[in-house]
């Protein structure tokens, strides 16, 4: 009950200070599992997106929150846990590198090399037929191979439970007009959860509400623009996908 009252109070404060306008282009608000990915300007980004979503989406969407910042005081931790149902991410954790075994086959086991035809080779005959290229790992294998120490592990658990999440692929707050290059987390999640809809979002003006280092918010009109979903194409490499996703976010700035 207390969390519900605090939710209504915070929603009123955020909308009073920012207007919290949500604009949907090519992607109507829909109760389906999604990964919303947006530019990152302020700690208030999480709060603004939460307030911009309609109630039926807020209840199934969990924003990520920097653990070191949002658990610094008991009040912050209670709000992010009880009100936002946030997913805490340890910014100091080191992402796990994929092993050769996982990259080789869906089951996580390395592909066995075909035995060489020694007699044919020694006789000067044709070499054995080359092996077929290893199949890409399945989403299930990728999730199973992710260690609990990986910073993506809490996000994977949230998605496995059916929740939608809000992430900021830059990994840290930007200071320019455009977001910084996206880190690999969005690509990995797209590989692990191909059925989840990836929705870009552009957050406008929130850095002026709560500039870095300030504790008192400044009233100013803000908006969140949601765009058409993007999808990881078959065989698409990490950097081309991340650059394309970043461009989808930037394009919403002009809508």
For each of these PLM feature ranges, what is it?
Residues 1-48, 53, 58-61, 71-78, ...:
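Membrane-anchoring hydrophobic helices of lipid-metabolizing enzymes
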Residues 75-78, 164, 172-236:
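A cross-family acyltransferase "interaction/gating" segment
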Residues 144-149, 179-180, 238, 242:
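A conditional alpha-helix N-cap/helix-loop micro-motif detector
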Residues 64, 87, 199-201:
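Hydrophobic/aromatic beta-strand patches that form the interior of the parallel beta-sheet core
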Residues 40-42, 170-173:
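Short glycine-rich anion-binding loops that position phosphate/pyrophosphate groups of nucleotides
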Residues 74-75, 149-160:
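Short, charged beta->alpha transition segments
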Residues 33-35, 162-168:
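Residue-level preference for the first positions of well-ordered beta-strands
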